[in-house]
């Protein structure tokens, strides 16, 4: 399925699909392509409001030249006064994509992928977005899952039954990010974890194996949350802030950082600091009020003048 224009080579063979505009929407009873070797949806934007089933499922969004043989998408350099879409691939809560292999590519700068439904692959799942990836549903593979985007926000489930790889500039997790085997997470700037990140674990973060978790980030903020693996947990970051009952566990734990903040209750510490400051102020006032006067006088006249001043 494509909104693009077929382009032929000199011999009349199909060479590319040129996609400049257009939307493909999956509605109603959905699309069952399991009898075909593969299903490919090529458009500037794609809306999935029903189920899509396939052996191999490919989506390509953005303004692209798409190779007809291998589906490699090369972004077109088009100047346009049209308003750019904010979402390239939108899987609604009532929609879903199910296949052995799923590959999602969005090339348009700043245009995101929104997954509110279920995207599930029995073999491999791959996401490559030149914008924001938002997971408010389930992004899952039984074997291998790789996701790359400018920024990633997960509120529900990102899970791999095998290895997991995430690469982004900013990662915010308030849900569960898990892998049954090894997990590698690379974040150029800030990784914020407020729930569970686990390797060697099931989708709820309970340890089931000895998979290792490797994290590379500019800054790691683990707040009232868990980073854990059944094997080695390795963090390489300029700053690591493990606060508010944050926990970092593993069979082995190695943290390489310039700044390590490991504090159980920052809010309580702030209150205690304020209380101590108040106590110090009271102490200073009491000391001033009851201090022994050691003023020295050289004459009776100086003494009388001083006593008159302090009356």
Task: Describe these PLM feature segments.
Residues 271-311:
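Extended amphipathic alpha-helical heptad-repeat regions
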Residues 1-230, 234-237, 241-258, 263-284:
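Extracellular and secretory-pathway beta-repeat/beta-biased strand scaffolds
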């Amino acid at each position: 399925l494509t909104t693009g224009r077929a382009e032929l080579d000199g011999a009349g063979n199909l060479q590319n699909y040129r996609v400049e505009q257009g939307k493909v929407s999956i509605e109603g009873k959905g699309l069952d392509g399991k009898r075909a070797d593969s299903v490919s949806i090529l458009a500037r934007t794609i809306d999935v409001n029903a189920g899509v089933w396939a052996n191999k499922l490919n989506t390509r969004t953005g303004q692209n030249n798409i190779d007809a043989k291998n589906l490699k998408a090369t972004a077109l350099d088009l100047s346009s006064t049209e308003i750019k879409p904010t979402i390239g691939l939108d899987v609604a809560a009532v929609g879903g994509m199910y296949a052995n292999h799923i590959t999602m590519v969005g090339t348009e700068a700043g245009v995101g992928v929104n997954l509110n439904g279920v995207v599930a692959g029995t073999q491999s799942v791959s996401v490559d977005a030149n914008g924001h990836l938002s997971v408010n549903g389930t992004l899952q593979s039984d074997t291998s899952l790789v996701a790359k985007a400018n920024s990633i926000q997960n509120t529900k489930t990102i899970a791999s039954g095998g290895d997991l790889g995430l690469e982004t500039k900013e990662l915010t997790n308030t849900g569960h990010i898990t892998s049954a085997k090894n997990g590698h997470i690379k974040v150029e700037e800030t990784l914020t974890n407020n729930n569970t990140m686990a390797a060697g674990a099931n989708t709820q973060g309970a340890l089931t194996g000895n998979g290792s978790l490797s994290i590379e980030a500019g800054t790691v903020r683990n707040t009232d949350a868990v980073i854990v693996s059944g094997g080695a947990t390795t963090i390489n970051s300029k700053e690591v802030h493990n606060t508010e009952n944050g926990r970092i566990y593993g069979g082995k734990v190695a943290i390489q950082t310039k700044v390590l903040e490991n504090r159980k209750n920052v809010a309580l510490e702030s209150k205690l600091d304020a209380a101590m400051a108040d106590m110090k102020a009271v102490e200073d006032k009491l000391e001033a009020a009851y201090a022994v006067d050691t003023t020295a006088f050289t004459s009776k006249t100086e003494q009388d003048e001083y006593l008159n001043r302090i009356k």
